[in-house]
Amino acid sequence: MGVRAQQKEKTRRSLVEAAFSQLSAERSFASLSLREVAREAGIAPTSFYRHFRDVDELGLTMVDESGLMLRQLMRQARQRIAKGGSVIRTSVSTFMEFIGNNPNAFRLLLRERSGTSAAFRAAVAREIQHFIAELADYLELENHMPRAFTEAQAEAMVTIVFSAGAEALDIGAEQRRQLEERLVLQLRMIAKGAYYWYRREQEKIAHHSE
């Protein structure tokens, strides 16, 4: 990559980080202005268009980055699990660490999931589907259950985890610890229920084939 391309990428990165830094519990992406983001990034507003077509393209890039960041962290968690440790507890801890370290990235995913922009809703839905698919792949490999079962289990788990994540954004450390324990219990119940359901279906098939 040439010097000019490196500088362009650096400025683009600065714009993304500037936009993330301006999000908060009180401030959504829709309320950000191009001028404010450019000023925070240290460039002239007119220079913004060298990097993004408009503010929406910047927002979609942020959604993609947030989803990718979360998926990469969860992959790392699964690698740690392979070396020993509780699958569910390690995954929950990793997820809560992500929220603690990147609250604005998670806020963006939560808000735009049901926001007014169809493009943003589709982008967040796509990221969540990637997340579900990767978890279903892992469950299929580890639990030796058919795809239909692992997809249903993964979708239920992700729904509960995202709901807990929304709650975790606005509570203190002790409440978050209690939330983690509750979440671990809920996910274990889903996992055991999915396995029990699968075993019962297998027994039905075996019974009918006799």
Curated annotation (Swiss-Prot):
Residues 33-52 bind DNA. One of its GO terms (molecular function) is DNA binding. GO terms for cellular component: cytoplasm. InterPro entries: DesT_TetR_C, Homeodomain-like_sf, HTH_TetR, HTH_transcr_repressor_FabR, Tscrpt_reg_HTH_FabR. The keyword Transmembrane does not apply. It is found in: Cytoplasm. Keywords: Cytoplasm, DNA-binding, Fatty acid biosynthesis, Fatty acid metabolism, Lipid biosynthesis, Lipid metabolism, Repressor, Transcription, Transcription regulation. The keyword Repressor applies. Residues 10-70 form the HTH tetR-type domain. Pfam families: TetR_C_46, TetR_N. One of its GO terms (biological process) is negative regulation of fatty acid biosynthetic process. Homodimer. NCBIfam families: PRK11202.1 (NF008402). Represses the transcription of fabB, involved in unsaturated fatty acid (UFA) biosynthesis. By controlling UFA production, FabR directly influences the physical properties of the membrane bilayer. HAMAP family: HTH_type_FabR. This is HTH-type transcriptional repressor FabR. It comes from Salmonella typhimurium (strain LT2 / SGSC1412 / ATCC 700720). The lineage of its organism: Bacteria, Pseudomonadati, Pseudomonadota, Gammaproteobacteria, Enterobacterales.
